[in-house]
Each structure stands twice: as structure tokens, then as C-alpha cells.
Amino acid sequence: AEVWGLPTLYLPNRFADGVLKTSDATYQLPVNEAAPFHNHIHGFLHKREHNVVAYSANEEGAWLRTSYVYNEEDPFFQYMPLRFTADFFFVLSEYGLEYKFSITNQSPKKLPVSVATHTTISAPFVDGAREEDIRLQVPVVEKWTLNERCLPTGDPAAERLR
């Protein structure tokens, strides 16, 4: 199945052997990246069905608010027994897509927070176009060294690109 969009990754990137350490807890996340990497990657929130809270549309655009409540009912709770609510707000207008995300901790323990989007692009964009006609340029500001398991080495000598 093809999936296109801008999924929100809660706990993005990789955790070596699935271990997530915070200032007040250590969580053993499931390893979902096979050998030779053996990491937990990208969390779980992007795979959850969100509830539509409100929406509206008119000639100027549209907006949508969704929410996801993470608690004991989520299968991932066995690995990270915390409670939170994730709220999403999307506005589509002539200016493009505006996206806001908030997360509210509802647990006595500290909630680890790391969020990213994972851009996917369906190309070519129009019928009859060819992939080789598309050029995507993304500026690189910093380059980080990864080890053989695709984990950052923490090398302070990361290249500064100009």
C-alpha cells in the first residue's frame, strides 16, 4: 500500500536496542528495525487513528482539528506507561497548508518529547511528466556522522556546510 502525506512522528529517529532514557525513567521500546540495525524507529503516533474534534470549510479554505488520547488502551502503553493527549490543527488556504501540533502530558512522570514529520512526495506531479524532469533541492546546514547501525555517533566534529 502506498502512503503519501506528512505523518507526525512522535519519538522520531532511532533508539539503540529500543532503549529510551529520560531524567526519571528508562523505557524499553520494541525493536522494529531488523538486523543489522536492531533499533526502535519512528515511534507509533503516526499509525494511530485520530478523532476529528471539529472542522469547517468555506470559499477561503478549510480547517480541521483532530486529537489522539494515549493511555492504557493503546498497545504501545506496555512499553511507555505514560498518558498524554496529542492535538493536531490543519488550515488549508491560498497561502498553503498550516500545521500545528501540541502534546499535553497527563502523567506524574516527565513525558519525553521529540517530534518530526516524515515528508513523502508522490512524483511525477502531473500526468505525462517524467521523474527525471523533477529536481528537488534541499539545503544541508549540518552533517552528522552515523555509525553502522545508523545512529548518530555524537561526534562534536560534525561538518558545518556552507
Where are these regions (language model features)?
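Acidic-aromatic substrate-binding/catalytic surfaces of carbohydrate-active enzymes
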Residues: 1-33
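Structural motif
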Residues: 19, 26, 96-98, 110
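Extended, loop-rich substrate-binding clefts of extracytoplasmic carbohydrate-active enzymes
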Residues: 32-94
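Short coil/turn motifs at secondary-structure junctions
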Residues: 71-73, 95, 106-108, 124
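A domain-level signal for the structural core that forms small-molecule/cofactor-binding pockets
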Residues: 85-87, 104, 109
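Short, well-ordered beta-strand segments enriched in hydrophobic/aromatic residues
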Residues: 90, 97-105
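Active-site/ligand-binding surface loops and adjacent short beta/alpha elements
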Residues: 110-111, 120-162
